[in-house]
Amino acid sequence: MNVTRLYFRVAGTKQFARYVHKYAAYSSTSFQKKKSHFPSPATLDHPDAGEDAFINLRNENYILNAVFDGVGGWANVGIDPSIFSWGLVREIKKVFNNSDEFQPSPLTLLSKAYAALKKSNTVEAGSSTACLTLFNCGNGKLHSLNLGDSGFLILRNGAIHYASPAQVLQFNMPYQLAIYPRNYRSAENIGPKMGQATVHDLKDNDLVILATDGIFDNIEEKSILDIAGVVDFSSLSNVQKCLDDLAMRICRQAVLNSLDTKWESPFAKTAKSFGFKFQGGKVDDTTITCLLIKSKNYE
């Protein structure tokens, strides 16, 4: 089965690569919503990534990337799951744009945004996973926060240097930030502080891949390594195009795998580990953001 380029939307942030500090970074995002075969309308106030949402932001000192997966179960009670995930994006953008007033961190950004979203009364109900990375262009440190079963990888020298672990309450029920209807009782009280925070010292040519579970449920880490391994990032004039193509290729492969009913997908393996029978891929919204680090020697 062939999947054409039109099935995918790519948001490449062409202006990310600026040698203001010791490090620069290039970023690109690719996504496809489930049961969709055409690009979303340009008139939307945000990209139509289904229940997923994402962020690519920068200022003079930091680069912020994040992915969110709105929990689809809310659709069963007539609530659009994307309203919550994109609501978080909206509030995080506000907080990040005012981050000169405080020392930013993924935990601070998400905590302030989540609190603001709850106070805004713009979301009746909903929930979402969250995975944020904040890259410091001055010292090369990547601060992260992952809550739920979205996540990120750090690829270095052709190997997985780090893979964030998933946080789940039970099978197919990830940790999630939520707003519940007033008449709804929830036993869970999950907040941003329950996410796993890490710090990593990044190096030249490190590749950071953030993705929702639509990616990780349908493509093995080794396959991601294989796809990334054939990309040549040595020429600065061609880096952005290569990164755009990489994000799209991984997204495309995950979507193709999700439609294969015969293979043992990562999701199928996880299901079996919990005692459930499942075969094939898992059709879902797929969102991936790639961040490539480049350093400059000022000696």
Swiss-Prot record:
Gene Ontology cellular component list: mitochondrion
Q: What's a single GO BP term from this record?
A: positive regulation of ubiquinone biosynthetic process
According to the entry, every stretch annotated as the PPM-type phosphatase domain falls at 35-293
Q: Which SMART domains match?
A: PP2C_SIG, PP2Cc
> What InterPro entries does the annotation carry?
PPM-type-like_dom_sf, PPM-type_phosphatase-like_dom, PPTC7
Which Gene Ontology terms cover its molecular function? Answer: protein serine/threonine phosphatase activity
**Ranges in coiled-coil conformation:** none
Q: The organism sits in which domain of life?
A: Eukaryota
Functionally, this protein is described as follows: Confers azacytidine resistance in high copy.
Kindly provide the name given to this protein in its UniProt entry: 5-azacytidine resistance protein azr1
Write down the species. Schizosaccharomyces pombe (strain 972 / ATCC 24843)
